[in-house]
Curated annotation (Swiss-Prot):
Gene3D superfamilies: CofD-like domain (1.10.8.240), CofD-like domains (3.40.50.10680). This is 2-phospho-L-lactate transferase. Coiled coil: none annotated. NCBIfam families: F420_cofD. Belongs to the CofD family. PANTHER family: 2-PHOSPHO-L-LACTATE TRANSFERASE (PTHR43007:SF1). Keywords: Magnesium, Transferase. The keyword Glycoprotein does not apply. The gene is cofD. Pathway: Cofactor biosynthesis; coenzyme F420 biosynthesis.
Length: 309
């Protein structure tokens, strides 16, 4: 059985940990959001790609879901001594991965090729693809002192900690972007596609904003795991951003966002009362993943449901 997973950088990697324990890793492909990618100085941040790489290689710092566990921060501290205070604390080994991306991009190497080099160097058997080799950037329109300001998502979330009145979210350049090498083939060859429990607006939305990808998904069986339980996001600013796009912060809002492509919506057991407002198949399970057993059980529930259809 082959599956393709659409992933951001927090919720979905937890579920990936479950799938990689119960499926041959070579049968898992992941298409990753790059809408938050940005340069900081001479390094290139691709936070969701890096988190997925570290998740598959069992190196992820699963307390922060960012960076490497056990990393050191000598470079970060030395930069502070020079007056260059990085808002995002980047570890030394993690910095090497980001330097590799920056150098490769400046030398004209495509992002899909860069990620594949890194995947192989980390001895990962699963395939990992950036959503596009072209720059698609998530932008957040906020209002501050009666003035509208357009921010990179990185600036909104890291610098401002998400503390702003959000008016809208855009995916800059998505109208012109193409799916990265291998993405459409992975979708076509998979038995089903899984949209993981990442932020629908800024983790999955950028992927779906590429028309080639969304059109390919319409031809496949698609599962989607809701990242919202009750009326609360499991993590991150999903609630604020869904409100800004006009969707209710609930499982119903997640369904409305994905309704053009989703066939099976995976909801937490506590959301059983939401079924009447959802016009697709619903699988109920424990979607709060605190332990490795939780992650494996959710992955297994999804696979069992697929096999029973």
């Amino acid at each position: 059985m082959k599956i393709t997973i659409l992933s951001g950088g927090t919720g979905t990697p937890k579920l990936i940990q479950g799938f990689k324990e119960i499926l041959p890793n070579e049968d898992i492909s992941v298409i990753v959001n790059t809408g938050e990618d940005t340069y900081i100085g001479d390094i290139y941040l691709s936070p969701d790609i890096d988190t997925v790489l570290y998740t598959f290689s069992d190196l992820i710092n699963d307390e922060t879901w960012y960076g490497l566990k056990g990393d050191t921060f000598f470079c970060h501290e030395q930069l502070k001594n020079f007056g260059f205070d990085e808002v995002l604390k980047i570890g030394d080994k993690d910095r090497a991965l980001k330097m590799h991306k920056a150098s490769s991009l400046k030398n004209g190497v495509k992002m899909s090729e860069i990620v594949d080099i890194e995947r192989k160097s980390l001895l990962i058997n699963s395939k990992i693809y950036p959503m596009s080799n072209e720059k698609v950037e998530s932008k957040v329109l906020i209002e501050e002192n009666n003035e509208k300001i357009l921010l990179k998502f990185h600036d909104f979330w890291i610098f401002r900690k998400g503390n702003a009145k959000v008016l809208d979210i855009f995916y800059e350049n998505s109208n012109y972007a193409k799916a990265a090498n291998g993405v459409l083939k992975a979708i076509h060859e998979s038995d089903f596609v899984l949209i993981g429990p990442s932020n629908p607006i800024t983790s999955i939305g950028p992927i779906l904003s590429i028309s080639e990808i969304k059109n390919a998904l319409k031809e496949k069986l698609v599962f989607a795991v809701s990242p919202i339980v009750g009326e609360n996001p499991v993590s991150g600013p999903a609630g604020t951003l869904m409100n800004a796009k006009g969707y209710p912060v609930s499982a119903v809002g997640v369904y409305e966002y994905y309704k053009d492509i989703v066939d099976v919506l995976v909801l937490d057991n506590s959301d059983i009362n939401k079924k009447k407002d959802i016009n697709c198949e619903v699988l109920y399970a424990n979607t709060i993943m605190k332990t490795i057993d939780d992650k494996i059980n959710l992955a297994r529930n999804i696979l069992d449901y697929y096999k029973s259809r």
